[in-house]
């Protein structure tokens, strides 16, 4: 009822919907001229070699989520919201990526991760392997492994890191280092007997074994690293948080053991430990802050769990020590989970936090030598509409009732999901519930226990060296190829001996013409 009254109050104040400055046509003309000047500056392309690469991945962050997050960001700053700018909005180059998997029109996060990290499209449910691998079929994996841009960067001597709000063994991060016929094989405790007997490794073990010199790994997923029934350090009484491994291995200790003599490897599980870290004295960092996924930003314990922004800040400072540069994968992974649960408020606050991390990374690096890319793996069947007035609370009601059942509805809705609610044979009256609550499940048209992904294209925002290569409508697997070209790594090293030629030629041309005239 409180939420209903607040929305009603906002709509009653609609007489002042238009800010005074926006009533003056000159305001819009000046704004357009500033945008035009910015666009004209793009004629001078940044063709530097990218020393550093940062890929920000908003899991499930479709265009409707980006727009709603922009409005939320503005409203959190006590503005109307629509006129706000996300940090990613400030990136000068924008493209669209087609997200389908090789066997799925509407994709999952594993096949898409293989595309934007490894540069090849793949089947849904598989990570780090080609489309020749069938989900769950361990015996189809051998010889079908594909490597990621993280591996390409490491092979060129760069530092590399992974930061996520999900498990570090989840679909997005795992495609950076693992090769698996099933994205859900987090530990050997989740694997079927035939896969174990077939010699396939679980994803947590691959994290330790495949690329042992990853400098930074931060996220959740402690329980997949410890033997079955090992009590969790933070939740010792909770059985669901205990270790899951059947092989008896302590993979945190194994992670320590793989590090070269003389190098300092640090494992942390508490925010205080992370923020107190002296990065100049640490060579390798593993931080696992929850047994499974990290807690939603709105519910986060500020004592024990770091925010995504805090993890990114530590990661960049760690990786910047390498004079050859770095590659960093940053995933705002729980945007996706919020949408699956129909909890739009959780999802959008996760998106705002990812954008906060984008801004922080921008302040810690320079676009002169750092290529930053922000994108999503897929969208969701999330929408907002209803002819809402300017400044309407993003989690509020539309200003109209249904002309069919005569009941109000929230601006935010889902095409399907757990928010399908029938009360007394009719659609639930949302004015009787707290629709502004963090865990409110927005109404959905079709009942499902979990809301589904959407199949439309996703945005790709780019800034820095060679960012102009990301333009138009591209296949999703193009992204790492463009980034690798910018950094002279992986399959795109060949051009690097002449990387400076376009700029050099442009600089020397006037001199050459002058010499010809003098002769």
Swiss-Prot record:
Any S-S bridges, and between which cysteines?
138-200, 488-496
Listed under catalytic activity are:
a phosphate monoester + H2O = an alcohol + phosphate; diphosphate + H2O = 2 phosphate + H(+); pyridoxal 5'-phosphate + H2O = pyridoxal + phosphate; phosphoethanolamine + H2O = ethanolamine + phosphate
Question: Which GO BP terms, alphabetically?
Answer: biomineral tissue development; bone mineralization; positive regulation of cold-induced thermogenesis
What span is annotated as the signal peptide, if there is one?
Answer: 1-16
| An example Gene Ontology molecular-function term | phosphoethanolamine phosphatase activity
Q: How does it sit in the membrane?
A: Lipid-anchor; GPI-anchor
Q: Where located?
A: Cell membrane; Extracellular vesicle membrane
Q: Which residues form the propeptide?
A: 499-519
Q: Please give the chief subcellular localization of this protein.
A: membrane
Which positions in this protein are listed as binding Zn(2+) 1? 59, 109, 377-378
Q: Where does Mg(2+) bind?
A: 59, 172, 331
Question: Which enzyme type, at the first EC level?
Answer: hydrolase
Q: Where is the lipid attached (GPI-anchor amidated serine)?
A: 498
As cofactor, the record names: Mg(2+); Zn(2+); Ca(2+)
Q: What is its EC number?
A: 3.1.3.1
Q: Which residues are glycosylated?
A: 139, 229, 278, 302, 429
**Annotated domain remarks:** Calcium-binding is structural and does not influence the alkaline phosphatase activity. At very high concentrations, calcium can however substitute for zinc at zinc-binding sites, leading to strongly reduced enzyme activity.
Describe the family membership recorded for this protein in Swiss-Prot or TrEMBL: Belongs to the alkaline phosphatase family.
The identity of this protein, by name, is Alkaline phosphatase, tissue-nonspecific isozyme
Q: Which organism is it from?
A: Gallus gallus
């Amino acid at each position: 009822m409180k939420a209903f009254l607040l929305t009603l109050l906002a709509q009653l104040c609609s007489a002042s919907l238009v800010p005074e400055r926006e009533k003056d046509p000159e305001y819009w003309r000046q704004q357009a001229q500033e945008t035009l000047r910015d666009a004209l500056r793009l004629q001078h392309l940044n063709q530097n070699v990218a020393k550093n690469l940062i890929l920000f991945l908003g899991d499930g962050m479709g265009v409707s989520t980006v727009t709603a997050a922009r409005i939320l960001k503005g409203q959190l700053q006590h503005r109307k919201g629509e006129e706000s700018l996300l940090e990613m909005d400030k990136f000068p180059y924008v493209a669209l990526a087609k997200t389908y998997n090789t066997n799925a029109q509407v994709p999952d996060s594993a096949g898409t991760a293989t595309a934007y990290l490894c540069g090849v499209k793949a089947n849904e449910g598989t990570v780090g392997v080609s489309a020749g691998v069938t989900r769950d079929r361990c015996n189809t994996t051998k010889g079908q492994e594909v490597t990621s841009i993280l591996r390409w960067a490491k092979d060129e001597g760069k530092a590399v890191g992974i930061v996520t709000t999900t498990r570090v063994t989840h679909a997005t991060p795992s495609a950076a280092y693992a090769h698996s016929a099933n994205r859900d094989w987090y530990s050997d405790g989740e694997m079927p007997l035939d896969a174990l007997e077939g010699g396939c490794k679980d994803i947590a073990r691959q994290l330790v074994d495949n690329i042992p010199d990853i400098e930074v790994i931060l996220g959740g997923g402690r329980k997949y690293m410890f033997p079955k029934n090992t009590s969790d350090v933070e939740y010792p009484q909770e059985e669901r948080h205990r270790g899951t491994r059947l092989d008896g291995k302590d993979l945190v200790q194994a992670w320590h053991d793989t590090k070269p003599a003389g190098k300092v490897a640090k494992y942390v599980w508490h925010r205080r430990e992370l923020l107190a870290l002296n990065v100049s004295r640490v060579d390798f960092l593993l931080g696992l802050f929850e047994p499974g996924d990290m807690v939603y930003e709105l519910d986060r314990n500020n004592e024990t769990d770091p925010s995504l922004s805090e993890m990114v800040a530590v990661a960049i400072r760690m990786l910047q020590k390498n004079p050859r540069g770095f590659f960093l994968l940053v995933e705002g992974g729980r945007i996706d989970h919020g949408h699956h649960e129909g909890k739009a408020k959780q999802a959008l606050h996760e998106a705002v936090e990812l954008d906060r991390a984008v801004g922080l990374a921008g302040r810690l690096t320079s676009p002169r030598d750092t290529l930053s890319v922000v994108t999503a793996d897929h969208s969701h069947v999330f929408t907002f509409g209803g002819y809402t007035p300017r400044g309407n609370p993003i989690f509020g009601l539309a200003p109209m009732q249904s002309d069919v059942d005569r009941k109000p509805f929230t601006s935010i809705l889902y095409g399907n999901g757990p928010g399908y609610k029938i009360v007394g044979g009719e659609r639930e009256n949302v004015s009787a519930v707290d629709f502004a609550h963090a865990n409110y499940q927005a109404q959905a048209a079709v009942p499902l226990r979990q809301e589904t992904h959407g199949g439309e294209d996703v945005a790709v925002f780019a800034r820095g060296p060679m960012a102009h290569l990301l333009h138009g409508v591209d296949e999703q697997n193009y992204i790492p190829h463009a980034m690798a070209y910018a950094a002279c790594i992986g399959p795109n090293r060949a051009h690097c001996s002449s990387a400076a030629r376009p700029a050099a030629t442009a600089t020397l041309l006037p001199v050459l013409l002058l010499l010809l005239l003098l002769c």
